[in-house]
């Protein structure tokens, strides 16, 4: 090494203030250059270091060089001190001046970097050079790549003056636009040179990885990628890695890259060609050869998409996730003990590193070529990418937007549980998906990509898939993207299952194209049995099908309903509901989905549960014409519709998409196609007549479907008139959007004593009034609170409106406020007010095989992020958002129309007949049919009413139930207050009725209802 170079290098490194003294070889060179004999001189000028101790630098040298020259000191001593001092002073001044000039130039250069002054003023020289080189290369990368990124103004032939005039505005606009784009990304942008160094990385990397833009720019990408992912990124980008890892690079870079203490600093001449695209040797010690698009590569084209683990300094606590030895985005040091034993070895390797999984969406950038022949591939200048950061797995709550739904899958990608809101977005119900493999649902062309994502998920613990196509149930496909995370048990660190957050990113496409035989008419193994509204569908999918059967409002909470456990294993629900139903002896009609593989979720049908109507299948394919809204119906289902067409609406899941709020007005392609399957069956004619009479004053379902203009006249006369008109239009339409809960259709048509009839009317009427107290916030219809089944006005006696208004609105607004979309199923709102009439005592004796609500903890049954009320599993309260939906006992032999009874019977059905309720997804607890639906036994509440109001087993919608299952005080007070008032009465029907009427002032309403009812009955037998 030349002494001068050594001196300069040492100065650069800041080891010594004076270049020469610290290096024994360099004095000799200096002396020689002055024309003096080097050897004797060395001895002579080392002498004074003993006697004249005034020169500290020389003292450092005395240790090595003093002994040999001891004899000559006396002779030379008088001549040396002055000369040496001058010489040293001169050399120090020269070095100081040189450094000053260098520093000045460096800082001038730093000021020109496109970085804030606060950053450039703090940079050291090496960083300034590194950033400058990166910036210059980036200009080349942008200008010489294909397509060039130079601005049109400068490259076009426009007048210079025009370009000058508009440039400040353009610059300002571009600056702001660029900032906004970067801030709106769920990740950061980067550009990588052909040798694998970062040319640019956006400042937002600090948000997602906690890393510094300045530190990363110009560094090797491999310094920030998990060791196990190096080969993958090299394959994807066409880089050749050096076999040794960090040392010297390929042929020409070995000297520069590996030499000296430079580490990452390679020699500037190691690039193989001027444009940096040479294929042998690079400036990056990790990379032996620059990017090439080899014909042998498994990738075609310039687009790439893959997941890698990148270093992250963001430490998260509470890690229950695995990222192949490094919990994604978690401090491995304190999380290692949670990983599988197989991963511990990897943890030891890099104990202090945290890694976060990112999806890199890359486009390779070729050099612009002027020849159009293109016989050979143009050289690659590098790669541009967006790195989409996955939400750190330690984040336990993710806000679900209107286009997202959650599934839980097993390690073979078989769906274990699906959220009910899937039916808002796709034409599948949750049961359709449960136990299906994603491989069987995914478009054939995307299967390989899905497989790659699957293996990444198992290896890295988290993955964000690229866009892939999920085949629709009835034809065509929908584009999805899925973020999947492996969830580990907090106790034993076993990997339990995979949580997938699915983003629906398109409408249904090519709906008339059949891509797979599963999209054809249903085969025997995928038949929906019409078993009436029992909706045992909830079979195992905790989230029941909200769309097709009465469970559409169910959400996580309800889903949980079925699960004896919290549904953490989605399978046990069905069994439990079924056995309960069977033991109850109620042949509940339920809609069971028989799926391809008889899993506990899907197909357990036993004679106790299925009524005789089981045999009528509903073809699952939708006719192409109305594929978004209607399913073809068999006779049975059409009959059901006659009885309860309104159910179509009642069962449509409450739109989670804001754009679907008006979904009744405009069919949206994302609405489930099975919306109209009305599972129900014939009821006796007397039942129908009475039901018709009861509902005469309500708008008919037809009106609802067609979304009649809002009618605000709630007077009985106008409503009767309206109903009669509807009846004339459709004489067969027997049911209304409101299903009176107590209506005898639910019971054998035995005549009912007048007092019971009045009490029933009273209770029913109250629920209607409550329901109509205010228009639902979701905009589904004017005054309705019937799970969006009603779009027309409902009758509300004038006196009653104010009495409910405040508490109802308050509860409802609380319910809808916390819901992800701000929308809440009206049914949820209902559940807040339901069961206040549970105190009516009926002479009928009830089964007391009930499980107290505590069997399911509120926390278990309440899943954050979903609009679902807590439903106690088969026992306890069934407060589903749909308590309305299914909790009306279906008549024992017959299938009951699937319509939604209006008085939410959460208090009744679930509590009374928990054992008989197959709390299937919808919270459809069907009790034995011999029991009246409108009376809750007085004892039930004494049995279950918990002392602490915050117990959370009331069905406050999940939006109103916090993580601990507590009802916020604002709701608790009113809500529990009502319950205490009405349910702890002593059981005498008369006294409970009188108390209730005093409390709610419903005497006038009752009279009005009775008049309406008797005038409407037109002599039908009671």
Curated annotation (Swiss-Prot):
InterPro entries registered for this protein in UniProt: bHLH_dom, HLH_DNA-bd_sf, PAC, PAS, PAS-like_dom_sf, PAS_fold, PAS_fold_3
Biological process terms in GO annotation: appendage development; epithelial cell fate determination, open tracheal system; epithelial tube formation; Malpighian tubule morphogenesis; open tracheal system development; positive regulation of transcription by RNA polymerase II; regulation of transcription by RNA polymerase II; salivary gland development
Record note on what altering residue 579 to A does: No effect on phosphorylation by Akt1; no effect on transcriptional activity
UniProt KW keywords: Developmental protein, DNA-binding, Nucleus, Phosphoprotein, Repeat, Transcription, Transcription regulation
Any matching Pfam family: PAS_3
Biased composition (Low complexity): 578-587, 611-625, 987-996
GO molecular function per UniProt: DNA-binding transcription factor activity; DNA-binding transcription factor activity, RNA polymerase II-specific; protein heterodimerization activity; RNA polymerase II transcription regulatory region sequence-specific DNA binding; sequence-specific DNA binding
Compositional bias annotation for Gly residues: 243-265
Bias type Polar residues, positions: 280-289, 851-864
Phosphoserine modifications at: 673
Tissue specificity: Trachea, salivary gland ducts, posterior spiracles (Filzkoeper primordia) and a subset of cells in the CNS.
Subcellular location field: Nucleus
One GO cellular component, as annotated: nucleus
SMART domains noted in UniProt: HLH, PAC, PAS
Keyword Translocase attached: no
Chain span(s) of sequence motif Nuclear localization signal: 629-636
Residues of the PAC domain: 465-508
Reported impact of residue 233 to N: Malpighian tubules empty into a single large sack that is attached to the hindgut and no ureters are evident
Main location: nucleus
Entries under SUPFAM superfamilies matching the protein: HLH, helix-loop-helix DNA-binding domain, PYP-like sensor domain (PAS domain)
Domain PAS: 174-244, 391-461
Null mutant phenotype: Tube-forming cells of the salivary gland, trachea, and filzkorper fail to invaginate to form tubes and remain on the embryo surface. In embryo Malpighian tubules, cell rearrangement is incomplete and the resulting tubules are wider than normal.
Top-level taxon of the source organism: Eukaryota
Misc. comment: Readthrough of the terminator UGA may occur between the codons for 958-Ser and 960-Val.
Record's function text: Transcription factor, master regulator of tracheal cell fates in the embryo, necessary for the development of the salivary gland duct, Malpighian tubules and the posterior spiracles. It may induce a general fate of branched tubular structures of epithelial origin. Functions with tgo to regulate expression of btl.
Name assigned to this protein: Protein trachealess
Gene: trh
């Amino acid at each position: 090494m030349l002494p001068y170079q050594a001196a300069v290098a040492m100065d650069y490194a800041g080891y010594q203030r004076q270049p020469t003294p610290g290096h024994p070889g360099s004095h000799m060179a200096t002396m020689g250059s002055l024309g003096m004999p080097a050897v004797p001189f060395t001895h002579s000028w080392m002498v004074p270091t003993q006697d004249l101790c005034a020169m500290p630098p020389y003292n450092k040298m005395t240790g090595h060089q003093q002994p040999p020259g001891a004899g000559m000191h006396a002779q030379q001593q008088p001549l040396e001190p002055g000369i040496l001092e001058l010489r040293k002073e001169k050399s120090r001044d020269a070095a100081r001046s040189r450094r000053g000039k260098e520093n000045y130039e460096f800082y001038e250069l730093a000021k020109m970097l496109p970085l804030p002054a606060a950053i450039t003023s703090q940079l050291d020289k090496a960083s300034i050079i590194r950033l400058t080189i990166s910036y210059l290369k980036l200009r080349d990368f942008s200008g010489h790549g294909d397509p060039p990124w130079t601005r049109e103004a400068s490259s076009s032939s426009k007048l210079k003056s025009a370009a000058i005039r508009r440039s400040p505005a353009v610059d300002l606009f571009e600056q702001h636009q660029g900032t906004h784009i970067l801030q709106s990304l769920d990740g950061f942008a980067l550009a990588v040179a052909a040798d694998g160094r970062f040319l640019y990385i956006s400042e937002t990397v600090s948000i997602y990885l906690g890393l510094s833009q300045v530190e990363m720019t110009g560094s090797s990408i491999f310094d920030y990628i998990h060791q196990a992912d190096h080969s993958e990124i090299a394959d994807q980008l066409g880089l050749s890695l050096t076999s040794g890892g960090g040392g010297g690079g390929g042929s020409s870079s070995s000297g520069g890259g590996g030499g000296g203490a430079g580490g990452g600093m390679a020699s500037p001449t190691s690039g193989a060609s001027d444009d940096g695209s040479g294929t042998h040797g690079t400036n990056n010690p990790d990379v032996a050869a620059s990017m090439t698009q080899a014909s042998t590569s498994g990738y075609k084209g310039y687009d790439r998409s893959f997941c890698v683990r990148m270093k992250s300094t963001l430490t998260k606590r509470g890690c229950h996730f695995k990222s192949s030895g490094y919990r994604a985005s978690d401090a491995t040091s304190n999380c290692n003990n949670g990983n599988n034993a197989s991963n511990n070895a990897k943890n030891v390797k890099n104990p202090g590193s945290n890694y976060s999984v990112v999806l890199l969406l890359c486009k390779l950038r070729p050099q612009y070529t002027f020849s159009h022949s293109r016989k050979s591939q143009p050289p690659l200048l590098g790669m541009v990418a967006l790195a989409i950061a996955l939400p750190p797995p330690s984040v336990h709550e993710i806000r679900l937007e209107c286009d997202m739904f959650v599934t839980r899958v097993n390690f073979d990608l078989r769906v274990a549980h699906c959220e009910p809101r899937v039916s808002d977005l796709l034409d599948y119900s949750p049961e359709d998906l449960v136990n299906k493999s994603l491989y069987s649902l995914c478009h054939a062309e995307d299967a390989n990509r899905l497989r790659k994502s699957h293996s990444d998920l198992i290896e890295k613990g988290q993955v964000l898939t690229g866009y892939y196509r999920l085949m629709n149930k009835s034809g065509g496909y929908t584009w999805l993207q899925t973020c999947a995370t492996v969830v580990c048990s907090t106790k034993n660190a076993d990997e339990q299952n995979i949580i997938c957050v699915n983003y629906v990113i398109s409408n249904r496409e090519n709906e008339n194209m059949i891509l797979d035989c599963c999209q054809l008419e249903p085969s025997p193994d995928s038949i929906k049995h019409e078993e009436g509204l029992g909706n045992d569908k909830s079979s195992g999918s905790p989230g029941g099908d909200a769309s097709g059967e009465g469970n559409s409002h169910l959400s996580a909470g309800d889903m949980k309903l079925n699960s004896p456990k919290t549904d953490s294993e989605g399978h046990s629900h069905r069994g439990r509901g079924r056995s309960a139903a069977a033991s109850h002896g109620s042949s509940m009609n339920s809609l069971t989905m028989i799926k391809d593989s008889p899993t506990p979720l899907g197909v357990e049908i036993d004679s106790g549960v299925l009524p005789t109507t089981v045999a009528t299948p509903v073809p699952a394919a939708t006719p192409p014409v109305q594929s978004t809204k209607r399913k073809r119906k068999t006779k049975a289902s059409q009959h059901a519709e006659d009885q309860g067409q309104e159910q179509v609406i009642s069962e449509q899941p409450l739109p989670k998409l804001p754009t679907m709020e008006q979904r009744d007005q405009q069919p949206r392609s994302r609405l489930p196609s099975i919306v109209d399957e009305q599972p129900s069956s014939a009821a006796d004619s007397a039942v129908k007549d009475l039901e018709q009479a009861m509902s005469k004053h309500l708008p008919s379902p037809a009106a609802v479907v067609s979304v009649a203009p809002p009618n605000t006249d709630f007077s009985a006369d106008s409503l009767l008139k309206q109903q009669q008109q509807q009846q004339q239009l459709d004489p067969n339409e027997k049911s209304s959007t409101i299903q009176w809960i107590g209506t005898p259709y639910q019971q054998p048509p035995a005549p009912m004593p007048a007092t019971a009839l009045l009490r029933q009317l009273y209770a029913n009427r109250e629920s209607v009034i409550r329901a109509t107290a205010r228009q639902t916030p979701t905009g589904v219809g004017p005054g309705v609170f019937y799970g969006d089944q009603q779009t027309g006005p409902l009758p509300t006696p004038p006196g009653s409106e104010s009495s409910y208004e405040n508490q109802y609105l308050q509860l409802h607004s609380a319910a809808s406020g916390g819901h992800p979309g701000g929308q809440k199923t009206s049914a949820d709102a209902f559940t807040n007010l339901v069961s206040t009439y549970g105190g009516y005592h009926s002479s009928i004796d009830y089964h007391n095989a009930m499980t107290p609500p505590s069997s399911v903890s509120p926390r278990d049954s309440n899943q954050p992020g979903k609009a679902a009320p807590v439903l106690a599993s088969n026992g306890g309260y069934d407060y589903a958002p749909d308590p309305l939906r299914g909790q009306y006992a279906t008549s024992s032999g017959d299938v009951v129309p699937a319509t939604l009874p209006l008085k939410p019977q959460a208090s009744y059905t679930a509590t009374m007949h928990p054992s008989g309720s197959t709390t299937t997804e919808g919270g459809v607890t069907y009790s034995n049919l011999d029991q009246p639906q409108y009376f809750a036994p007085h004892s039930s509440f004494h049995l279950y009413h918990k002392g602490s109001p915050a117990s959370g087993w009331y069905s406050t919608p999940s939006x109103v139930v916090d993580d601990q299952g507590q009802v916020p005080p604002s709701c608790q007070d009113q809500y529990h207050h009502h319950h205490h008032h009405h349910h702890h009465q002593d059981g005498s029907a008369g006294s409970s009725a009188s108390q209730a009427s005093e409390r709610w002032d419903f005497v006038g309403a009752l009279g009005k209802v009775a008049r309406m009812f008797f005038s409407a009955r037109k002599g039908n037998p009671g």
